[in-house]
Swiss-Prot record:
PROSITE patterns: MAGE (PS50838). Residues 1-75 are annotated as: Disordered. Keywords: Phosphoprotein, Tumor antigen. Coiled coil: none annotated. The keyword NAD does not apply. This is Melanoma-associated antigen H1. PANTHER family: MELANOMA-ASSOCIATED ANTIGEN H1, MELANOMA-ASSOCIATED ANTIGEN MAGE ANTIGEN. It comes from Mus musculus. The modification Phosphotyrosine is found at residue 194. Residues 1-13 have a biased composition (Basic residues). It comes from the Eukaryota. Residues 61-72 have a biased composition (Low complexity). The gene is Mageh1. Residues 1-197 form the MAGE domain.
Amino acid sequence: MPRGRKSRRRRNAKAAEENRNNRKSQASEASETPMAASVAPSTPEEYLSGPEEDTSTLEKASSTPSEASSTALVQKPVTRSNFQGTKKSLLMSILALIFIMGNSAKEALVWKVLGKLGMQPGRQHSIFGDPKKVVTEEFVRRGYLIYKPVPRSSPVEYEFFWGPRAHVESSKLKVMHFVARVRNRCSKDWPCNYDWDSDDDAEVEAILNSGARGYSAP
């Protein structure tokens, strides 16, 4: 056989062998590389939400006072948050007030008590800024409070209820612990439906004063 043909055959055989070796090497590297996650982890919501999620949904949430009369269904997961600090203290105070008032509290009563702590709607506060905006917009938007008109009230009055996120992240037991700390009583001694005298402003003020100084869940 001519020398040129033999040389070409050797080159072709060598090239084929190199191709086989390259394919084997690529297959080996692919098997050793971890598979990328098909779904990226969800990022926390913009408002202090943590990584732990609950499958509950926000069912009746109004984002601003102007939308309170037309409550819309919002289908999104309720995420447990790491809501801390002075705003948490203010929130827990309002939740406690709502609970002891029979699961709802009129806005006038809330501001009557907050006013004794130096918080007036529309007036800047050194810690909270505009407290009305924090309570009626931020807490409502985040799902901690429901803020809506009192039925058949004239002139129109508003009242607060626990929001869906408050039910997820807190409980009436935690609120009773909070109130019991003010009263120096064990929460197990409290009946589930505490008969609260709405005229007892001193007790209400004591609860919110305690909350304003700081609260940590038991």
